[in-house]
Amino acid sequence: MNENVLIVAAHPDDEVLGCGGVIAKHIDDNDNVSVVFMADGVESRNYQDFESNISDRKTHALKACSILGVNNPIFLNFPDNRMDSIPLLDVIKSIEKIIDKLSPTIIYTHNDSDLNIDHRITYQAVMTSCRPQQGSSIKKIYLFEVLSSTEWSLSSYGSFVPNCFVDITNFIDVKIDALNEYLYEINEFPHPRSVEAVKALAK
């Protein structure tokens, strides 16, 4: 039976860095995959032309998702790196509406120890939205690693200790192709957000 898969990413680029290969694998398995972006990923960067850069980032996100095989990602447009300024209940309700509409069987989202505040709030909101209740469609929840956020977490947040691994050997190239849509996030090796580091983590 095909799965309904929901990716809840804090920002455009997190979906590729965190689970781009897994997304492509689900698509190859004929699963239904939806992607939700919680924050716009622009505001904290102090761009002068704010609206134009939001539009530009969305364009790149649409292209990246298309490369992975996902159509019509959802943009919730919470403020970048300021999701802690939004009442948590509002964030939870926005996710609950999407879950009610899409009835996902599998959800992927951030780890709770990530350094980035939006990642941690996204995790908290997703886990609250997925609390066990009668009639829930959700069977599995997976947390993914995002380079330069997960491994840079403070010790007080705990650490990411993965216990599930997926072979994406056949999908690493499409992951990199999608990542190249976010060129402003790619750095030179040995920075963790370099093509070489992303490939190394996938091995």
Regions flagged by a language model, labelled:
Residues 39, 43-71:
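Short, surface-exposed acidic-centric catalytic microdomains
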Residues 7-17:
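Short, glycine-rich nucleotide/cofactor-binding loops
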Residues 10, 38-40, 146:
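Cofactor-binding loop segments of dinucleotide-utilizing enzymes, especially the Rossmann-like FAD-
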Residues 14, 42-44, 82, 150:
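Flexible, glycine-rich phosphate/dinucleotide-binding loops
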Residues 17-18, 56, 90:
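Short, conserved clusters of charged catalytic residues that mark active-site
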Residues 18-19, 44, 123, 174:
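Hydrophobic positions within alpha-helical membrane elements
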